[in-house]
Amino acid sequence: MVAGEHVLDLACGTGIVARSAANKVGANGRVVGLDRNDGMLAVARNASSGISPLIEWRRADAQNIPFPDSAFDIVFCQQGLQFFPDKSAVLREAYRVLEPKGRLALSAMRPIKHNPQYNLLADTLERHIGPNAGMMMRSPFLPLSTNELRDLLKSAGFQDVQILIGIGPVRYPSTKEFIRREVASSPLAGQIKSLSDDNEFAIMVRDLEAALESYIDDDGIVFPAETYFATARR
């Protein structure tokens, strides 16, 4: 990323990537953050107040990006692809709005079988709250192998596809905090809060602690998490 480039942050959420991009492309560049969630965009707008160049925040569907062909030098999608029902359509749109030789960079959590500690959390939520809770906790994990992700990108038209697997430690001070922080920004937050002073929450914590026993040390819980990092060119 260099000064003057035009950048699209797809599924921008609270705008962390867009703000970082704005610092790099400078006053002669352009940064657009696109998301379909009004609440996320409100947080992003507030957090970006005073950043130059002015970041443009747009509410839109990533399957129908409201920009012309070849409008951007770079498209980012950080931890967003896994949430789109039609991933192929989103990638085709990303390809369309990139200029020739434009770049795509995305990240997504690897399948949950490669992140078994989160599967244990999902199982625990399923037992104590219900099937929908488990399903929601599994939704941030892209259900594609490395080769399937590569094929998906190539089928959208991308070239020079490179995929890396990042493995990094995740640490929480306690099992209780693991549960609370992981569901804090999800629709489950209210249900967890309603249990927080209840015996059922304590039972749920003990249940998960037993499942995560081999990952507990004197500072809390620590385990490896696996993420895809993919880059490609139009």
Could you describe each region identified by the protein language model?
Residues A3-G4, A27-N28, L98-L104:
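Short glycine-dipeptide loop
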Residues H6-I65, I74, A89:
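Class I SAM-dependent methyltransferase SAM/SAH-binding core
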Residues T14-I16, P140-R234:
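Conserved Class I S-adenosyl-L-methionine
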Residues V25, S48, L125, L153, ...:
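Conserved hydrophobic residues forming the short capping helix/wall of the S-adenosyl-L-methionine
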Residues D61-N64, P68-D69, D86, S145:
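Acidic/polar helix N-cap motif
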Residues D73-K87, R110:
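A short SAM/SAH-binding and catalytic strip from SAM-dependent methyltransferases
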Residues S88, R96-P173, A189:
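Conserved catalytic/acceptor-binding region of the Class I
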